Amino acid sequence: MLAKLVQLPRDLLELVYPAVCLICAKSPTSPRTHLLCEKCLEAMAAQPMPSSTVLAETSPPTSLDAVHAGWPFDDAMQALIHAFKYRRRPSLSRILGALLAQRLYKHLAREIQQAILVPVPLHRRRGRERGFNQSQLLAQTLAEAWKMKILPRALERTRFTQQQATLTAAERQKNVEGAFASTEKSNLPNQTIFLVDDVFTTGATMNACAAALKTAGATQVIGIVLARA
């Protein structure tokens, strides 16, 4: 899929994309991505995946049944996700989403045949500030790669919440409790949902989203994330 990324004129690329890799900040970027160097791309592909976690039988029980992550949340992934979200590099969704699709396919091949993709939503205010929803962009790339149905607005944030990164585990859970609601009740009963986000830390956000999806009738909610902290 990386080979299918749109090729832009070189002079325009030099204006839009960095001359050096977003991870190492040293090597020239690869012509395949224009954002990462070949060495860092190869390192990402070779890195072991975090073990998939089944959450349905944990204590206390969670609404999220399992979570699958492409990478650990190390320095390299932190740099990429920071650039993606805060340095406004939405084009990273195509690269990271394609790599994630390749890494997770064999672990989810059976579920992919029947599941529906749903991104974790941003509040309208934060969406205006950022200009895009990183989870929705990732979900769209996964939908193309896996030929899956996506419901980009199946969930909404019912209230503005503080950014989770600044909070403790207990504060994160309280911050997002009851903050999500389903807008697609007719399409969710008896469905398996792939819930897409960028990072899984304590799971508070994804669990709150999963609770809303199950209230709307979903039978299984599986988290799909770039990285797990």
What feature does the model see in each segment?
Residues 1-229:
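Glycine-rich phosphate/pyrophosphate-handling loop used in enzymes and phosphotransfer proteins
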